[in-house]
Every structure is written in structure tokens, then in C-alpha cells.
């Protein structure tokens, strides 16, 4: 199958060499034991003086988007200029005030994108701060500064790897040399920005951001030492703070250990009120959001991430999840996600990455319950909340959100109550009744809901899929002949019943006051200009036979009751032909 690609002698030889693939794979697969290979990757970090577990977050940290750089570099097909611009505008519209826009030294397109933002009036609002990123090298720092020339304000971000392993393996320099390189980077950055001889450059309000890659695997003592050197060189103030950034890079520990590291660093930075601490977590172990949340308690001032968790490998921290976690704890996150499905659509179109349907908040199934027990609890909670609002008598828990199995109000992310219940073979009467209530405005009695839910389950099993709300409502109208009955006059109905030989004719007589037979009827008003009443008749034809349900709508309560019994007769007796009434 792959032979056409084996065009060189080397490839041909490799293809014909026995076991050449297993030999390569052993580099990753051979291990004497789990403990030897993976044990002690993260050094113990005893920190008994920790205070973050006792803290409660009261206000949101600044949320910082890295979608245009960290997110973009992780895509199989990087964004075009137009796509980056569309995503940038989306981020601004959502409410992000600090956005990383480019890596100017990467290529000309990155540089040109920054220039376009700065040179196009209105693209950078007065309260939005853009950030450019560069390695800690003279030419690249200079290039980054050139890219934002003329901006009213900008963040210049440079970084160095910080763990002993990375410094020894990749940089091959001592700790002293590493600290000196960081100090030099801060000094050089200041010399060509705040202290530049160019008045145009000096007119920009500069913020310097120095970052530590692989922070989670670094020694805190070394990080503190380097931070002090960088801070002293840049010389920030309370009014013009600098930023110290720490990145887990590859998530290495549990979130509580990361929080200990953050608190230790935060508490040991001199003149802490002149420094903002920003945290950049990754999701390699699945704990990016948890690590960021605990870091917020431990002293982080800014939290970095991408929409929907885009990013290298398992992704950066999901800004949507973090923000809505804040919202559902009563904290305004600072960004507007009230049209989340629209935001997701733009993201998916641009990145070509689908958001998993089970993703917290943004997934298509996040609010949807299929289980009958869950649906019943949701419908009862929503009915209680609705009735409390309509009657003007708030319950003890309102206006607080306390609906079982719904972590937030669907309206807060731009969804409707139609999204909370999915109907399939696992659904129960509560879910089916809720869908009919939303779609048709009918408040089904429990017995009718139970009976109809069985019919719905049979249909779902037959089709082998979920039934849409419209399908459920149409099935209800068909099952109980609701629309046909509503189209006929009372006289036609009476005559139609009298023409049948059904023993249930007397039940109709009871409804209109002509006789007394077994028929239990409930009713309620409708919010409809024409048909103002709905009635539900539970008719028992004979003692030995099960009861039958019918549904009727009418301009009067009497008419609705009449039609409900006729509906039950139609369900029970095939001899009753509506064709003759056409």
C-alpha cells in the first residue's frame, strides 16, 4: 500500500528490514518498571505554611486570551490573516481586555498582522491591551518592539525555560548564566522601549512581561532569584506594574502542588504590589482548569488560556470553563458568554476543531438530560421556579438558581429551555410532559404523561434515535387527535358520537349534563387568543378494561371537556370515523 512512497534506497532498505518498526517504538515503550520510568518526575514540595485552602475567591482575575498565538500554533492548518482577524474581533466583542496577538519573529505574516491592528483605526479599543511574544534574544526582542511601534499601549513578553532539566539539557548553561540572561533580557527590553531614544516608541505605555517556561518542574528558589533580577532591572511601580508569568508548559503535578508553588512564589517577590502574577496552565493531566482555579486562590492576578481549551497536545486551559465556573459561583468573570453557541460556531469554523458535545458549558449535550429521573427533577425544579415568578410569590430559594441537574440557567449562555431535555427510549413521563408543555402549552396530568411516554419510547426504539421536540409534539397531537377534534363544531361532535355504537356514548352525555357515567376530567386555561381552554379526560369504558385518555381544546371550558371525551372515544374505538366529518 505504501510502496509508491519508498523511492530511495534508504527507505527501501528500511522497509525490507525485519522488525525495524518495533525497534523504533522501543524507545518509547520499553521500561523496567513504572516507578523507575515515571516516579519522582516532580520533586516533593513541602509547604506547610500554605494559606490558599482557607481562601475564598471574591473577584475574578484578569482573563487573558492566547488563542491567536498559542492556540494558532497548535492547529494542523494555522489561521489565515482573515481568520485571525475574525477571531481577534470575536475576542474583543466577548470582552477580553488583554489579548496575545502574535509572535512577530515567527514570520512576516505574524508581524504584518500586528501592524494591521495598530494601523487600522478602531481595531484596538482604548481599554484593550495587546501582547506580543518573543524569545529572550536581541534580534527577536527588537523585532517584537518594531511590530507594535505606534501603539498606545502594549505588553512585551519574553521568556526562558526554567527547570533544571531544561536548562541543563537544552540551554546547557549554569543557573548563574541563566539568571544573567534573564536580567540582560529585561535590561535590553527597557533600553529599546521605555528608555528608547525614539519618541514614538517612548510614547507607548509599555508593560514588560517575563515568563518562566516549565515552571511546574522548576526549583522555586531559582525562580525567585531570577524574578528579583528581572524586577530590579525593569524597575516597575504600583502605577506601572510588570508581569511575571509562570507556565506549567507540560502539566506535571496535581493542582494542589501547583497552587503551593504559586503561593510560595507570590509571597516571596519583593515589592509584590508592583508585580502582576500570571498563570498559564496546560491540560496534559486533565487538570488545567483546576490548577488555574487553585492558583487564583494562591495569588495569581491573571489567568491565561484559550477558548474551548485549544492548544498544544491536550490543550491550554479552557477559558470558557474557567469563566463560567466563576459565574456559577456568583462572580462576574469579566467576559460575556451569553451567546455561547454563536461563539462556538465561529471558533469551530475558524479552527476546524469540533467542540466535544460533553464539554462543560459549551457542549451540545451539557444541559440536556436523557434519563427519566433527571428529567423529572429538572421539570419539577423549573415548574417551581416558573410558578414562583408567575404568582409573584418567590420561594425561599429564589431568585437563587437551584434547579436540580442544571448547573446554570440556560439563558446565561444563550440557550432556551428546549435544550434541557432530550427524548429517547430512556426518558420518562417528566421529560415528555416538559417537552409537550414547552411546545404546546399543555400541562399534562401525570397519568396521561405516563401513558404517552410509553408511546414515545416505542417510537424512539423504532427509529433508533433521539426524538426532537417537534416530533414529540406532533406525535402527541396525532395520538390524541387533538387538531382534528378542534376543527369540528360541537354539533358535529355530538352527532359523530351518536352515530357510533360505542358503549361510551353516555360519557359524553355526562360532560354536557345529559347523563352521568365514569369520566374524570381536569382542565386549565391556555395562553391562546382562540382556544382558551385545555381539558384531559380519563374515561373508563368498562370495569374490566383500562382507562383511556383524551385531550380537548376549546373556546370554552365546556367545549374543551367535550372534545377531550371525544378524543378518548377516538383513541378507543376505531369505528368512529372522522372522514365522515371532513
Swiss-Prot record:
Pathway: Mycotoxin biosynthesis. It comes from the Eukaryota. The keyword 4Fe-4S does not apply. Its EC number is 2.3.3.13. This is Isopropyl malate synthase AMT7. Gene clusters encoding host-selective toxins (HSTs) are localized on conditionally dispensable chromosomes (CDCs), also called supernumerary chromosomes, where they are present in multiple copies. The CDCs are not essential for saprophytic growth but controls host-selective pathogenicity. GO terms for biological process: L-leucine biosynthetic process. Keywords: Transferase, Virulence. InterPro entries: AIPM/Hcit_synth_CS (IPR002034), Aldolase_TIM (IPR013785), LeuA-like_post-cat (IPR054692), LeuA_allosteric_dom_sf (IPR036230), PYR_CT (IPR000891). One of its GO terms (cellular component) is mitochondrion. Belongs to the alpha-IPM synthase/homocitrate synthase family. LeuA type 2 subfamily. It catalyses: 3-methyl-2-oxobutanoate + acetyl-CoA + H2O = (2S)-2-isopropylmalate + CoA + H(+). GO terms for molecular function: 2-isopropylmalate synthase activity. Gene3D superfamilies: 3.30.160.270, Aldolase class I (3.20.20.70). It comes from Alternaria alternata. The keyword Transferase applies. Isopropyl malate synthase; part of the gene clusters that mediate the biosynthesis of AM-toxins, host-selective toxins (HSTs) causing Alternaria blotch on apple, a worldwide distributed disease. AM-toxins are cyclic depsipeptides containing the 3 residues 2-hydroxy-isovaleric acid (2-HIV), dehydroalanine, L-alanine which are common for all 3 AM-toxins I to III. The fourth precursor is L-alpha-amino-methoxyphenyl-valeric acid (L-Amv) for AM-toxin I, L-alpha-amino-phenyl-valeric acid (L-Apv) for AM-toxin II, and L-alpha-amino-hydroxyphenyl-valeric acid (L-Ahv) for AM-toxin III. Residues 61-341 form the Pyruvate carboxyltransferase domain. Induction: Expression is up-regulated more than 10 fold in toxin producing cultures. Pfam families: HMGL-like, IPMS_D2.
